[in-house]
Amino acid sequence: MKYRLIGVGASLVVAVMLTGCQAKATTLVKSDAGQVTQAEVFKQIENQATTQQAVQELTLNKVLNQRYHVSQAEVTAKLKAFKRQAGANYHMILERNHVTEPRLKSQIKANLLMEKAVSAKYPVTKAQLKKARAAYMPMTTVQHIATTNEKQAQKIIAELNAGASFDSQVRKYQNNRQAHTTAGKLAQFDSYNQTLAPAIVQATAKLRVGHYVTKPVKTVMATADTKDKPTYEIINVVSRRSKTAAVTDDSGKQIDVTNYLREKIQQQRMMDKQTQVATIRSVFKAAHVKVVDAHFAPAFNDYLTTQNS
């Protein structure tokens, strides 16, 4: 699962400032021109967007922490999954977003709390699982040939139709040494893949094992070789796992396909803005959240009804 890091640092800094705002006489800076007090800083920042966001996040985290429990083991598992996805870029990602690992853990915990809130409000039904299972393409291995020339792509397919092997076509039309070494094979992927162009995943799902596309698959993805030019892909399905086979989840753990599909359905819901808003409204209402300081009312406009505020 992906985590949004941008803005986390700023929100946390403001949040720390706000948690101590009751001591309004506290002097933060002294100079010949006078003192800068915490009350002055609070007045300066209270209407800023980052401050509004920080107040909203503090409130949400308090409410969710009271209603749901996230263990340290759960946070650690998600952190390991994030590190595995980021690979060698892990520390660079943190540095670019001005986030330390402890702050990342806090954000992961907040995400997990929200996941549990969404799951509680919108439990996955048998009908939804049945639909997901029917649409699911399990882990599949494909060979591919990519070209920016549509006519050449059509020629490659014509030669395949005439009896040429896919391996020979890879050697003939791909200049990439790695493609020659792997016979054009891509890493295994399923229908939930978010790395490849959606058109490639969709085309693959329609093919049976041992079959290739009858028309080139057009994609537009920036790569070192193609820049932003349209790319025409010829795809051949080499193998496909059973729909009932165990699947490796985001944490690297083997789980049965039903739990995997349930996890994916919930992840998709977490990306849906309307679902998030409805869930937050629900937990705020249950916790009787009320904005006392009118300056912070805008932060809750989407989440509180007139009766609550």
UniProtKB/Swiss-Prot annotation:
The keyword Signal applies. GO terms for cellular component: plasma membrane. It is found in: Cell membrane. Keywords: Cell membrane, Isomerase, Lipoprotein, Membrane, Palmitate, Rotamase, Signal. Residues 1-20 form the signal peptide. It catalyses: [protein]-peptidylproline (omega=180) = [protein]-peptidylproline (omega=0). It is a lipid-anchor. Its EC number is 5.2.1.8. Plays a major role in protein secretion by helping the post-translocational extracellular folding of several secreted proteins. This is Foldase protein PrsA 2.
